[in-house]
């Protein structure tokens, strides 16, 4: 059975999202949700979850280059993951997101130059990278 997985790139101002199928190991960008100090419009996220009906949610875990937690943002990403699980009753996994934003910017720039580098595009592409990295980790 192939599962549908939805990923989130948590940020205090914007939360990117992506969707993917476990069978193909590929992901596509969805939507960037505006956040107010890390708090999204939960109704918008609920609408997306109802539309796509994922079996699992993956949240990018921000760390430094050595994999250590970042003092301010890492605990907030974990809290966001807990809230997703509590609100929607879906399993949630955290996944290392080191360098995902840098990689997302590079990919978007190569596809469309500076015009492609909007905050929403970068956050959604970061969610794609997080999810595809999660797929790779599952197949080890």
UniProtKB/Swiss-Prot annotation:
It holds the Pfam family RuvX. Keywords: Cytoplasm, Hydrolase, Nuclease, Ribosome biogenesis. It comes from the Bacteria. Coiled coil: none annotated. It is found in: Cytoplasm. GO terms for biological process: rRNA 5'-end processing. This is Putative pre-16S rRNA nuclease. It comes from Vibrio vulnificus (strain CMCP6). The lineage of its organism: Bacteria, Pseudomonadati, Pseudomonadota, Gammaproteobacteria, Vibrionales.
């Amino acid at each position: 059975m192939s599962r549908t997985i939805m990923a989130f790139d948590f940020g205090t101002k914007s939360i990117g999202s992506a969707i993917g199928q476990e069978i193909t190991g590929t992901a596509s960008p969805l939507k960037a949700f505006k956040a107010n100090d890390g708090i999204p419009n939960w109704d918008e996220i609920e609408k997306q979850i109802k539309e796509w009906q994922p079996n699992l949610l993956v949240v990018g875990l921000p760390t430094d280059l050595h994999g250590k937690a970042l003092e301010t943002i890492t605990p907030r990403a974990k809290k966001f993951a807990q809230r997703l699980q509590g609100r929607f009753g879906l399993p949630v996994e955290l996944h290392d997101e080191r360098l995902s934003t840098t990689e997302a910017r590079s990919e978007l720039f190569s596809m469309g130059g500076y015009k492609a580098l909007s905050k929403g595009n970068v956050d959604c592409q970061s969610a794609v990278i997080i999810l595809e990295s999660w797929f790779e980790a599952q197949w080890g």
